[in-house]
Amino acid sequence: MPFSASDRHDITHLWEKMAPNVEFLGEEAMERLFKSHPKTKTYFSHLNVEHGSAAVRAQGAKVLNAIGHASKNLDHLDEALSNLSDKHAHDLRVDPGNFHLLCHNILVVLAIHFPEDFTPRAHAAFDKFLAAVSETLYSKYR
């Protein structure tokens, strides 16, 4: 998926805002996912997914750090996310529809915490980026 110069700018800018707070923001995105879509908790049955748990905080940080890695590799998402794609498809067997649900919650968190930066243009760019990340992650399901 080609990203325009303005897409790249907005994706990079939002990631730079997020990067110092990946644990906090990731935890909030995961908690929102679990609250709004309780069935997604089944993939984390081995973890304490209660509000404020260290496990949710760590998982949220892991998710956002992977997104940060992807944001630095916009032209090579397949390569950058290959191992993660394999893991989700073959080991974890996550329902690919859940990627969209998590992406939505990440966008909600961005809108809440960075209202000045989360302009309509930035929203569209980051949504496009997360859709590309999701598509890359579920590409190995075929």
UniProtKB/Swiss-Prot annotation:
Protein name: Hemoglobin subunit alpha-B
Organism: Aquarana catesbeiana (American bullfrog)
Tissues where this protein is expressed: Red blood cells.
GO MF annotation list: haptoglobin binding; heme binding; metal ion binding; organic acid binding; oxygen binding; oxygen carrier activity; peroxidase activity
Keyword Metal-binding: yes
An annotated GO cellular component: blood microparticle
Family note: Belongs to the globin family.
Stated role: The alpha-B chain is a component of adult hemoglobin B.
Domain Globin: 2-142
Record CDD domains: Hb-alpha-like
Keywords for the protein's UniProt record, in alphabetical order: Heme, Iron, Metal-binding, Oxygen transport, Transport
Residues holding heme b: H88
Residues binding O2, per UniProt: Q59
Highest rank taxon of the organism: Eukaryota
